[in-house]
Amino acid sequence: MELEDIVNEEMPTTEDVNDMLEHTDKGRTKQTIRNCVTVLQKDPVLKKAIKRNELSGRMDIVKEVPWERRNNSSTVTDTDENNLKMYLEENYELTSERVIKAGVDIVSNENKYHPIRDYLESLVWDGIPRIENMLPHFLGAEKSKYTIGVMKMHMLAAISRIYEPGIKYDIMLCLVGSQGAGKSTFFKYLAIKEEWFSDNLDHLDDENIYRKLQNHWIIEMGEMKATITAKNIEQIKSFLSRQKETYKVPYEVHPEDRPRQCVFCGTSNDLNFLPLDRTGNRRFAPVMTDMSKAEVHILDNEAESKAYIEQAWAEAMVLYRQGNVFLGFTKEIEEEAKRLQKEFMPEDTNAGIIQEFLDDYDDDYVCTRILFDEALHRTGEMKQWEGKEIANIMNNAIVGWKPHGTHRFGKEYGIQRSWKRMKDSVKKDKDGFIEVPEQLEIPFE
């Protein structure tokens, strides 16, 4: 077979495609989904032109079409739909909107693609390690097992969310430091393309939150606004732990589960940016930046910065393909994560007041009512939320006491749930000195 014959066979004309369609006895094109699918699969202009974007969930036009498009975006617009209908009407007598809609849905799904997956698979690593140096290089962060570990974890999580949408990952990488260090730019460049990045997440209870996640890979919470405006810490935990959103996009009939394909990042100039959580802020991975120690500012040479980050993604892809991907704090870095999580929380004044009270407290049993009255010096009836707050402090922030069950506290307080002083806890006498047991060995002569 000659080359010209092969080309002609692969690229049929509109007349050839018309001959493939089912017609009525009068020679008119039947308004069937099968006919529409055939046209979309075989027409020289429309073949592989419309694909379903697995990142956005929308349909994209990915090749040149015989009408003027409204903007530079690949996403199908109303104007595209109207031009497609006119093209099908003029060339194939297909006019049924129901048929055209169904045909486009079927064929675009057959031709689905993932732009980020395609990008990642196109990368070739040059063999030079960069992930371990990214945070020190651009942001002056300390190079340590912790900073290397959280950067690698976050990049592998971002890749995992593309290949395994909805995979469990509930940690937010947070960059802390002075304004102008390039923290937000770092995350924007990390997303590779501007359309894969978003910093438009200000409220976690936004009813249209899915629209702000859709089509984005790296999502920054600038100045941690979304966590600041959250109703409570549980709302933040729930949001970060969620693996999917369930919603119905416009023009679709049925709602669908949309597994998350994004990871979340935070930036802040405030050193006390984390919410007060006495159970621990394990969902946050804070990294302190220092612009004065950075090897380069990320904006000094945009092309070089982007090339560096692209090679870091190529390196991360090599690690991902090797397997053994762990999307959490390893034992090696967990202690440092806990220390930093506490360091970036606001001071817990009530916990400090209660701890000081208990250090001088005579009894070995205590309850929330005693702490409410005598430690915090509050008056009136203790509200339910106040009792919960005190219990939370006792269970998570106080040293030397443990939950005990019920205990009788006399006429004033009656039987209450209690905490008991632990045996190895020390108690001060009335003058503020620690009692030393007789058998304790004095460490000097």
Q: What is each model feature region?
A:
Residues 1-130, 145, 149, 380-385, ...:
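N-terminal nucleic-acid engagement/recognition segments and initiation subdomains in replication
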Residues 276-295:
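A short helix-turn-beta junction within AAA+ P-loop NTPase domains corresponding to the substrate/partner-engaging
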Residues 209-214, 249-267:
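AAA+/SF3 P-loop NTPase mechanochemical coupling elements
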Residues 233-256:
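Conserved catalytic/switch belt of AAA+ P-loop NTPases
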Residues 104-214, 369:
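P-loop NTPase catalytic core of nucleic-acid-dependent motor ATPases
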Residues 327-445:
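DNA transaction DNA-binding modules
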Residues 218-240, 274-280:
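Conserved AAA+/SF3 P-loop NTPase catalytic/coupling segment centered on the Walker-B
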Residues 215-217, 243, 260-263, 279-285:
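Short glycine-/polar-rich loops that comprise or flank the Walker A/P-loop
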